[in-house]
Structure formats: structure tokens, C-alpha cells
Amino acid sequence: MTTATKITFIRVFLIPVFLVCMYLAEQYPFMLYVSLAVFAIASLTDLIDGKIARKYHQVTDLGKFLDPLADKVLVIAAMAMFCERGIFPAWALMIVLTREFAVTGLRLIAVGKGRVIAAAWSGKMKTAVTMAGLCLMLFFNGEFFANLLNTHICPCFMTVFNWVIVGAIALVTLYSGIEYFVKNRDVLGK
């Protein structure tokens, strides 16, 4: 097993750790910051494993499969936890899920026709914006910052902040999904 794949497996292992920390944060608010640390480390492994795989020629079929799957599961797990807490709307999660299923379906059709649809720049941007946005939501929705910002800046600060992040994630996700289909529309022919 390559170093890059081992790093990807670390990300996979961190997903249930993140979920447990999020559940514990309901009883122990400081655990939201532990959740942030776990999520941030998991997100950083996405950058690291890709760079290592390319630099040291460790690109494998397992890595090509596992890396994007780990990204999707990590991000969707965080969004689902935020939905449960009432700070990430279900419609935004549905946009993300729909895009992921649609692009995966498009890729499967392409493979059936002997083509591979490579990751587009917009897909990488979607991942970066989503992971950064979720990190910011974890950071600022913690008890300390939420109370500080809502009390001393504006009572509705957190609501507005969360909606801006959700909006950015939804827009970049929609753009990325549309771009994949526009650039590869010939795959859907005959």
C-alpha cells in the first residue's frame, strides 16, 4: 500500500471520530472545537495524499476510488450533522447529494463508453470552498464565538454568517455540477 493511500485511509478513519466528537458536542460544547480539529486534519489529508501520489508516482486505482469517496463522505457527514443541529438547511444538503450522484452517474456512463472524466478545476474548487466553509462554520458556531459575536456584534450574526457559507457552498456545487455536464454532454448522446 502506498503512502498516499495510507493517508487517505487516515481520512476515512477520522470520519467516525469526527461524528463521535460532533455528537459529544451536544453535551460538551468544547467538543465542537475538537470536531473542528478532526475535520481540519481530515481535510488537510486530502491535499497531502494527492500531492504525494503525484510527486512520487503513487497514483493507484484504489487511491482514485478511495480519495474522492472519502472526501464526499467527510463533507456529507459534516453537513448532515449541521442539518441535525438546524444550522445547515436540508435543501442545501440535497443540492450537494444530487450533484455528487449526478456526476458519479455521468462518470459511470463515460466509463461504459471507454472514456474517463477527469476531475475539473471547478470540482476541486467546490471541494476547497466546501471544506473551508465547513471549517469556518465549526469554528464560529462553537459556544465561545457564537455567544461573543451574537452578543457584542449583532444578534443575528451567526444566522447571516451561516447562510453566507451555505450559499457559497450551494452556488459552487451547482456551478461545478453544471460544468461537468456541459463539458461532457456528448457522453449522454447515443
What are the residue ranges of the model-derived segments?
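Alpha-helical transmembrane bundles and membrane-interface segments of multipass inner-membrane proteins
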Residues: 1-190
